Amino acid sequence: MNNMDLGYEMFCYQCEQTANGKGCTKLGVCGKTPEIANLQDLLIFQIKGISCYGKVLQNEGQHIDKNIIRFIENVLFTTLTNVNFDSKVHVELLNESQRIKENLRTITGEIHNQTSYATYDLPETKTQMLKDAQFAGIMYDKSLDPDIRSLRQTILYGLKGISAYGHQARELGYYSDEVDEFYIQALEALTDDNLTVEELIRMTMRTGEAAIEVMKKLDEANTAVYGNPAPHRVNIHMRKGPFIVVSGHDLKDLEMLLEQTKGTGVNVYTHGEMLPCHGYEGLKKYPHLVGNFGGAWQDQQKQFDDLTGCILMTTNCLMRPRESYKGRIYSTNVVGWEGVKHIGKRENGEKDFSEIIQQAIELGGYPEDQEPHEILVGFGHHSVLSDSDKIVAAVKAGKIRHFFLIGGCDGARPGRNYYTEFAKMVPKDCVILTLACGKYRFNKLDFGEVAGLPRLLDVGQCNDVYSAIRIATGLADAFGTDVNGLPLSLIVSWYEQKAVADLLALLSLGIKGIYLGPTLPAFLSPNVLQYLVDTFDLRLISNAEDDIKTCLKQNI
């Protein structure tokens, strides 16, 4: 299945919305062109080659330069769904990858693992790079065992998810040496044709362990810098005056923008996965952080269309900007789209947001206040576990029957209304935990209270799967059981590679019976999927009513 033999212009199946559930071959459903897709294949090929040399240094007991780790992390993040669509950026990264590889070659000398990844030299022109990219394609090696390919891609997509969390933590000055070393180990393993299916399954579980470690580090970074999230009411309607909408996941960018907008009269709204920022004391202390705008990422084109303010994209998910707002949207970090203004970082780590602030002022914003409407956020592990005695007592008294974690990535597929229906059908004596942008399917509904607690607890961003794990293990300890013994069901929606990292994290802990949807990943071969079903009782969602009955082991 060489994509060139089949007349494919590209091949990508890393996200949930991949064409026909099999793979994008002409244009990415995400908006990725064949040119970008092929440059990304070559970038991944290059960092695998870098890792072949890096592994030699690791085996000699040496640590890899953190600048190289940062580069690998940024490349992985750049190739994640809905992050960067700018070919110029990709060519710059490719040229840098060759410089790093050549530098490592001079340090290591000739290495034992002389794979094509290690020995390949990047040509000078983009045209030639694109010609070479076919050799880096996922389907290039027609003789490769489909289970080996499936596991390699699963590991790679897990690494992409880890890189997003690692990047966020590193922006705050936090990183894990263990995860940094693992990037090299895992990428090098993807070049090793001697590894068996069993060995790659072990590496897949290690990827899940690395995902937990990086989420733990990001939780540590966010809470050390901004405090523990605490319950907080957030206005989801607009206030009078000029404004900037901040999307993505990066708390540091939001803080810098809030600092620079102080006293300017510009209001700041979160969007998408930035909603949980309102729970952090270090961010909600700014009075001009006035609320949250809109819904999940897939609605952005419609919702940004007639905005009378500016938009800042700090991480994914970026969709093709419509002409109506292309002049009002800015990117930063690894995010990019050709023709969209990019705000870079100075050597001291600061960013200059003066242009976006000035444009927001000129646009004028909203002419009048809308009637306020509030939702509740801020239920991280620290907040929830401080009430654990109360929760345990309520469960033992029969006041709380069951917990449902309904969360993950949202997306455009019609079948995702399952998650809305599910949340609405959850019995009144059950608690719903939610996280990531999947929450927008139901987080504006009123679920009321049970046993003196809100029935809907917003745990945070996609990386706050770590918070959910802490809550689950904390409650399990209180009940003297393990997570699988809790009255807890996990109903997970996935879209991009952070969700892959999250799923692998849960599986690496031995958590069973997870419901995954709206469809299964195209990159899972039948045998790999069967292994996950047999080992972890992984289930595809069916319909909300039947799945709730199964979770509760009885009628609603």
What is each residue range found by the language model?
Residues 2-228, 233-241, 245, 265, ...:
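Long, compositionally biased, glycine/small-hydrophobic-enriched stretches that function as flexible linkers
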Residues 2-19, 32-36, 48, 66, ...:
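Anaerobic metallocofactor- and corrinoid-dependent redox/one-carbon enzyme cores
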